[in-house]
Structure formats: structure tokens, C-alpha cells
Amino acid sequence: MKRTLPGYLVVLLVLTACAATGGGSAGTSPPDESGGSGDSDGIEHPTGTDAILVVDSTGGFVPVQFMATRLPAFVLLGDGRVIMQGAQTLEFPGPALPALIERTLTEEGIQEVLSGVEETGLFTADVELNGAQNMVADAANTVFTLDAAGREVTISIYGLGAVPPDMEPPPGMTSGEVQAHRILGQLNDGLMTLDSWLPASAWETEGWQPYEPEAMRLYVRDVTDEPPVDGGGLPEHVREWPTEDDPAAFGDEEVFFGDGTRCGVVDGELGATWFEEMSAATQMTLWTDDGDRRFSVVARPVLPHEDPACPELAGAA
């Protein structure tokens, strides 16, 4: 039996309203393109480590450190792997690495997800929906990026979750955009809870497993001359720098940080060493190479579809 993301309707009426009132760009219903990987009747999509669908967050009033280490909320890769953020622990201090998890869909599962996305009717052309800026300040943009059926489409929506689905359109926002908030909110919720509606046959693996990255970006900062961070009475946690390089010369300086932070990429054996190191650390752990100098290290796992290089942050939003 064909299943789709729960609660979705075809939104031709919404698209018509958006197009008529200028609430966002909208195209016609997507063509029936097929012949994709593994299913001649399915929706074509990338294979391997290329991304099919990514849900990310950009902008918002956040520190540059958060901006640099922010991770997508959801990634579906061409090989069926789904990578997302798992449950966060309440312990203090928290673990140094984010709790990323992964599980693999079958081709049937990929098609179930893509069918649900297509049936929203929204992924026909790039759209920016910014009307909520008139009612919510400093919110983030939720960005859906889809590569399927021979198209690459990006939908960016400001303040997703901040617009009640039954509200009258505020100034600067069309009724079509209000409905788009409702539909994309449902889509987002469905993607974050795949287990609740996908059949068992949609999964190649039985359960979620911790995601172990093949590469990480490390943001290293010399904090030797800074006062200790208040750890709530906990003793300072200092570990030995695990490699032979000089922490003070690690990577390249990230000027946009404004505090001497340096960024470099570790992979291969070095990446495995640092993954083990960061897995044993907390958010308050410091590292030393001589007993006197102190360095903070923040790791940002690199996902399979991403360029591992440290990104240029100047002008980011």
C-alpha cells in the first residue's frame, strides 16, 4: 500500500494563491519523471553520497561559533542513509560531539519519502518565503534542498513554526504563504519522525546507530590567558593534545571569529584519533601540549555530501 507523509494535501490552491499575490515563486505541477536508481517506476534521484534531501537552518541571531558548527537537521543521501540529530542528554557539561544518528532506507523507503515531498506540490521552483519577518525578529531560515526528478529545488522559509496555521495573514504575508508554513511545518515534522509512519520494509537496517564521521572540522582557540570558565564547581578537565603538531599553529585563522580561532580538517588516521579524543571529552574540556598552555577545541563533524574544507564565514547570515 502506498504511504505518504502524514496529513499532506496537494496544494494547487496554495500555489495559485502564492502566484496571484506575489507570496513566492511557484511553478506548475512537477512532471512525472522516472527511471531513477533501483526502481524504473520511481522518482529519479542521486546515488552514493550525493544528497537527495537536506533540511538545514541558516541565519538567525546566533554567535559566529554556533553558525560555524551548525548541522543540518535532516539529510537523505543517495545510498539511502538518513543522518539526523539524535536525542540530547541533560548531563552537565554535555558531550563535546553532537549526537548524530544514522539509519539506511531501502529504495522503497526513499521513494516513500520522495512521494510525500512531491505531493506537497511546493517543490517546483526555488522559493524564498520571508513574510514572517514582519511578525518575528531574529528567527532562522529553514532551508529545504531537494535533488530529485531531474530538478534541484531550494525552498527557504523564515520563522518556520512561528506562524499559526489558522491565523489571518498579517501585513506583508499572503494567505498562500500562511498555508505554505503549515505544509512545510508538517513536512518537517514528518521527516523528523520517519519511524512513526514508514513501514518496516522501508528500512534496510533495524535501528538507528551513532554516526561516525570520516572527517571533522576542528575549531581551535588558545585560551591560556583567559579566566577559567565557571564549571558549576566541577574540576577543570584538561587532556593532552593527542597529536604531534603545534596547537597554536593548527589550521588557518578564522578572521570572522575575531578571537584567534583557527580551523583545520582532520580525516583518515588523524580523523579517527580526534574522533576518539572528542568522544571522551565534554563541552568544557581543554587541551594542553606542555602543561601550561590551554586550548579549546570545538568539533564539527563533516557529513558525506559536504565539502570538508572550513567554510568562508565572512558575510554569512
Predicted segments, located by residue:
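Bacterial N-terminal signal peptides that target proteins for export
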Residues: M1-L9
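Short, flexible N-terminal segments of the mature chain
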Residues: F66-A87
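Short, internal acidic amphipathic alpha-helical interface segments
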Residues: E108-A132
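C-terminal motif of bacterial Sec signal peptides marking the signal peptidase cleavage site
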Residues: L15-A17
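Acidic/histidine-rich, surface-exposed loop or edge segments in extracytoplasmic proteins
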Residues: G86-L100
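Second-shell loop/turn segments in exported
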Residues: L97-T104, G131
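A short, structured loop/turn motif at beta-sheet edges
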Residues: G78-D79, T106-I110, L146-E152
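Short, well-ordered, aromatic-rich surface patches in folded extracellular/luminal domains
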Residues: A20, P30-V62, F66, F123-A317
